[in-house]
Amino acid sequence: MNRTLMQMKNKTSEFWKNRSKLQKILMVSALAAIIIIGIIISVFASNSKMAPLYKDLSAEEAGQIKEELDAKKVPNELSNGGTVISVPEDQVDSLKVQMAAEGLPKTGSIDYSFFGQNAGFGLTDNEFDMVKVKATQTELSNLINEMDGIKNSKVMINLPKDAVFVGEEQSAASASIVLQIQPGYTLDQSQINGLYHLVSKSVPNLKEDNIVIMDQNSTYYDKSDSDAGSYADSYSSQQGIKSQVEKDIQKHVQSLLGTMMGQDKVVVSVTADIDFTKENRTEDIVEPVDKENMEGIAVSAEKVSETYQGDGAANGGTAGTGEEDVTNYKADGENTESGNYEKNSNKINYEVNRIHKEIAESPYKVRDLGIQVMVEPPDAKNTASLSTERQDDIQKILSTVVRTSLDKDETQNQNLSDADINNKIVVSVQPFDGKVNLDTNTEESSGIPLWAYIVGGVLIAAIIVLIIMLIRKKRAQEDEFEEYEYEVPQEPINLPDINEEENETAESVRRKQLEKMAKDKPEDFAKLLRSWLAED
């Protein structure tokens, strides 16, 4: 065993002496890196990952759970001011089941289950009323906590005593609620209205006017009517439509000009004025069929012709000056002269066009539109490199976009001329000094400089090459040692005669001969040692 250790020690020492200084530094560095990596891996492997078992605990609840975990000898950690308790991740589910079976955490709140568990115990009327109010508060708080954005809540209910006398006025109930809103969350008006309605319907004789809701920052939440919510929703909808119209026109113009000038040489901004007036109207229009002659279609016609000719034609009627006669009108029989009578009448019924329209106007119209365009010339340092003809082309394109985007009724009512359309367009030709060069900022955006990747890659490659060299060197030495181990020296080794003193023993003489040989002929001395080791 000792000889084996000596052989390994000698080989290691000889291997180390034959290495250059650079190789020694690389070997030590690689060994240190391997040791450090192994330590880091072992540290992370030994540390079990902790996961929250319960969150948002009170001091009392955290104390109860920690005491139970310590009794079970379960590793645990408290964080976030003692409100969060963590245990090993692989034990979270089992511990939750165990804690629930033991009734932990005990919140101290009374809910409706109290009446089922304590039905056999006697309670006075006052005690029963107190327990009932407490249970109602707890159940109502649990309902509120289920809403989005609410982390926790506390409810205080005040129920009046029943009236003793018939004529006595019954007092109204009241409720106060304090909400703990999650960070970064804002309750919308519909949620607030829902809270008021929920609390009002959960407590008898509780009007919504007697409810007060606040958050942890003392912000008061008031109930609002549905119209206010609809107005807010309408405003949000209108702003969304306006933004969408501007975005669509901006993309269209950016695509047109970007194709012509280059995407990085054009910046487009669009501002729109949208008319959201809604109009529903009914029109009953009557117009002639023949608009030139202003005549309709003849539906029916009636022609009457009446003729009389003869002597003694009576005028008929009650003429004369009698009681029923008309003054200055001849009575019957006064005139028997001959006469002629003719009467013609034409009656035609015309039908016209009757148009009934129920018109619902578009929910929005583009009332006004403005387009601002910034163009970088081909030569950024020379604004004159963008020709006037190209600028005129851009102006014409934008004029067409504005004219076709505006509502036709608005265009006709305002009598927009080409000059008016051009006033809605601005084209600015100037260099883009604030342009971001993505090529130069790639290294900065990554967060890690490029040279760090290069150095890291070189070090990793050097370590890999060094390990390969060491393995190959070790194999070569083992092969060489095996050759020496089985190789029998062919030439005898002559030891110099150094017997200077006759009285010396053979052992001392041999030792001196070996020392002299080691100094004068180290290679032969090494071969001799190998042969002795092989014999052993």
Curated annotation (Swiss-Prot):
It is a multi-pass membrane protein. The keyword Cell membrane applies. Pfam families: YscJ_FliF (PF01514), YscJ_FliF_C (PF08345). Residues 308-342 are annotated as: Disordered. GO terms for biological process: bacterial-type flagellum assembly; bacterial-type flagellum-dependent swarming motility. Keywords: Bacterial flagellum, Cell membrane, Membrane, Transmembrane, Transmembrane helix. The keyword Membrane applies. One of its GO terms (molecular function) is cytoskeletal motor activity. Gene3D superfamilies: 3.30.300.30. It is found in: Cell membrane; Bacterial flagellum basal body. InterPro entries: AMP-bd_C_sf, Flag_M-ring_C, FlgMring_FliF, FliF_N_dom, YscJ/FliF. Its main location: membrane. The chain crosses the membrane at residues 25-45, 451-471. One of its GO terms (cellular component) is bacterial-type flagellum basal body, MS ring. Disulfide bonds: none annotated. The basal body constitutes a major portion of the flagellar organelle and consists of two rings, one in the peptidoglycan layer and one in the plasma membrane. The M ring may be actively involved in energy transduction. Belongs to the FliF family. NCBIfam families: fliF. This is Flagellar M-ring protein. It comes from Bacillus subtilis (strain 168). The gene is fliF.
